A protein has these predicted regions:
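Extreme N-terminal tail/first-helix region
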Residues: 1-17
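Conserved Nudix-box catalytic region and its N-terminal flanking loop in Nudix hydrolases
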Residues: 2-6, 39, 48-94, 140-142
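Nudix hydrolase/Nudix homology domain
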Residues: 2-7, 72, 141-182
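A short coil-to-beta-strand element that immediately follows conserved catalytic motifs
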Residues: 8, 103-110
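Acidic, metal-coordinating catalytic segment for phosphate/diphosphate chemistry
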Residues: 13-49, 54-55
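Active-site-adjacent beta-strand/loop module that shapes the phosphate/pyrophosphate-binding cleft
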Residues: 25-32, 116-135
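Short aromatic/basic micro-patch
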Residues: 75, 126, 150
């Protein structure tokens, strides 16, 4: 049993609320009595992320530009979803199909992680999609330009170590999936 105590929220107000971003400013009291009046929380939708593997044991990644840091990244297919409109499972398959044109023959949830719980509210729901097959072309959003990349399962760990795969959620999903990959 821990003696740690939660913070108390004294006041909360939305300081930014638009389609792309919601930010809440909280006034909180710490267990030691200190007051922080400008603790900012990013309210983000949950993410469905899928690790797709072909029958030839290649993992399908997407390479895309991320404007916040001005770089291209290798990531697993993923996207935001609204749990009042679709399940994490449905969202994961939708994102896989939209971003890569592939669908899975076998599909299962392998975990749920918090993205960045010090500032963000969202969770990442992780799925393993095995024996995926191509069923069509990508159906990308207007903000997306995505290259589909195939990497053999046995090469992935080295690519993480070499710094070629650096997005935290993708790295966590890959490491977690090692237990489940047959």
């Amino acid at each position: 049993m821990t003696n740690l105590k939660k913070w108390k929220t004294l006041k909360s107000k939305m300081v930014l609320d638009n389609y792309w971003c919601q930010v809440r400013q909280d006034e909180v009291e710490l267990p030691n009595g200190k007051i922080i009046d400008d603790y900012f929380v990013s309210i983000k939708p949950d993410v469905a992320m899928v690790l797709p593997i072909t029958s030839s044991k290649k993992i399908i990644f997407v390479r895309q530009y991320r404007h916040a840091v001005g770089e291209f990244f290798l990531e697993l297919p993923a996207g935001n979803f609204d749990p009042t409109k679709e399940s994490a499972e449905v969202a994961a398959i939708r994102e896989l199909t939209e971003e890569t044109g592939y669908i899975p023959q076998e599909f299962r949830k392998i975990g749920t992680l918090y993205d960045k719980p010090s500032k963000d509210t969202n969770q990442i729901h992780l799925f393993l999609a095995e024996n995926v097959s191509k069923v069509g072309e990508q159906q990308l959003d207007i903000t997306e330009e995505i290259e589909v990349v195939f990497i053999p399962v046995e090469s992935v760990l080295e690519k993480i170590v070499q710094g070629e795969i650096t997005v935290a959620g993708t790295v966590a999903a890959l490491l977690l999936a090692l237990k489940f990959i047959s």
